[in-house]
Amino acid sequence: MRILVTGGTGFTGKALVRRLLNDGHDVVALDYKEGIKTEELRRWGAAVVIASVTDTDAVRSAIDGVEVVHHLAAAFRELDVPNTYYQEINVGGTRNVLELARAAGVRRFVYCSTCGVHGNVANPPADEDAPITPADYYQQTKYEAEPLVKSFESEAMKTVILRPAAIYGPGDPERFGMIFRRVAKGSFPIFGSGQVFYHPLYIDNLVDALAAVTNDGVGDGGTYLIADEEYVTIENLVTRVAKAMDREVKTPHLPFWPLWLAGHIFEKVCQPLRITPPIFPRRVDWYRQNRAFDISRAQKEIGFHPAVGLDEGLRATARWYQQEDYL
């Protein structure tokens, strides 16, 4: 089967491309810039198209002969772009790919949204019908594209929406890198109680879900939260990262609000200069917002059963960070 993966060089995209190739599919990966990762995808056997999802001619060419689209490409919390950029890529780009997919006779369209559309979960765990309260333009525009995707659902082209939790694992130095690096230093300051919930999602588990909904009749027209079996408190997560690294870690508790104020000040100062602030509000919110989800719908309807548990995933991630000298 010929499959298009947009955002093919991203953390999730790259892992999905490899899985689909290993499963015997013919894969086209679309991404907006050339680099080491695109060369790696070519070595694996994927066709690579360098273009934005807003480039109609390039996407039309990439989608020719494709049966299934996995739409993963997104503008993800870019510091030095206007908010209209999120609208252009996450909503406009999605519309462009949808329209071209329908015109090309694509029979399945899988849209990768985010659990972040639910914002701070008031009564954890949240299911798919919990309130939609996005906290930033990334989350807002990812949600705005969801009804757009549903509007293209038809007998000819089935759609599926996945809302992944906090993705981590070997192959990505950023998402959990901060946690591992601080633990490696032996001290992880916790601002606030440390008792808010956080819901990890190991990369292989997410790829299993994406591979499942590639198949006809799996999840047609549905929206699914995708996360690991277990959600944990921030403090417990830090402790288990330390265990995975075979390290001792101190977790001193500090007041939250001074950090929150500093985050807003740094963002205001750094944004006009187009530099990344050392602290910013989204990262500060990690210490105070609940992120915990009910995955029972995905378990029942698409057969999603996370194969890799938290401790196993953390150990594998720790080994990769150490091998790649990120710690």
Task: List where the protein language model places each region.
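NAD(P)H-binding glycine-rich loop region in Rossmannoid oxidoreductase-like domains
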Residues: R42, A46-G92, L100, C115-N120
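Conserved Rossmann-fold NAD(P)-dependent oxidoreductase catalytic core, especially the SDR/UDP-sugar
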Residues: R95-Y138, V160
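Flexible, glycine-rich beta-alpha linker
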Residues: G119, M157-G177
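Substrate-positioning beta->alpha
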Residues: E144, D172-M178, G192-T214, G221-G222, ...
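Mid/C-terminal beta-alpha module of Rossmann-like enzyme folds, strongest
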Residues: D216-P278, I295, D311, R315-A316
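Active-site Tyr-X1-5-Lys
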Residues: A135-V160
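Amphipathic terminal alpha-helices
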Residues: R297-K300, H305, G309-L327
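N-terminal Rossmann NAD(P)H-binding glycine-rich loop of SDR-like oxidoreductase domains
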Residues: I3-D23
